[in-house]
Amino acid sequence: MNKLKSRYKVVIYDCDGVILDSIESNYVFYNRVMDFLGRPEIDRDNDDAKRVLHTYSFNDVMEYFFVGDPRREDAFNFAKTIHYRDLMPYMRMEDGFVSALDQLKGHTSLAICTNRATSMDMIIEDFGLTGYFEYVMTASQVTNPKPHPEPLLKVLDYFKIAPEDALFIGDGEVDMQAANSAGVPFISYKSHLPALARLQHHAEIVQHVFSNL
């Protein structure tokens, strides 16, 4: 493995849907807010609602569901009382993720760029990911979260690299849009979004990173 050469100086991961299968935890979180306000649960057949709650930042999701609701501030305040660790039982790590990190570490720098705000440090600790990522960019660190390119541009600035020297792996439109706007090569993970490659397993990502140009 030491003889392998990475195509990229930095590999950047989205969190939800790439590192973690967390869709159920997102439904649980926002349905608790709905229940607090006496509103019906989110329709799981509503693809647009699923897309928003799974990929957008907390503030953007709350605006999506509660814009115009006179209890909007109550919804925000209650949501902030829900602790991440209450949702952890509804999350699981994507198969093969740690193995992929073990293969990549030492050959390329690793980073995270997520629309999560305050829970990422706990996720890294609770899922045994401490020590893998040199830089973690969250929605709380930027003025404009994904789909704006600001988070990815800040990652590039941290590593002092050109956009083409990074690879961003995401599963949502916000990831694709941010990557395109920042000029960063994009891999679509378990989705059919337009991308440099559409891959289903983390082992395939490793193969791509070490493949010949």
List the model feature ranges, each with a label.
Residues 109-110, 185:
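Residue-level detector of anion-binding/catalytic polar loops
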Residues 113-114:
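Conserved phosphate-coupling serine/threonine residues in phosphotransfer and NTP-handling enzymes
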Residues 1-9, 117, 121-213:
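Asp-based, Mg2+/Mn2+-dependent phosphohydrolase catalytic module
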Residues 13, 110, 166-168:
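Short glycine- and Lys/Arg-enriched binding-loop motifs that mark or flank ligand-binding interfaces
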Residues 106-107, 182:
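Conserved dinucleotide-binding and phosphotransfer motif residues
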Residues 3-98, 102-106:
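N-terminal helical cap/lid subdomain that shapes the substrate entry/recognition surface
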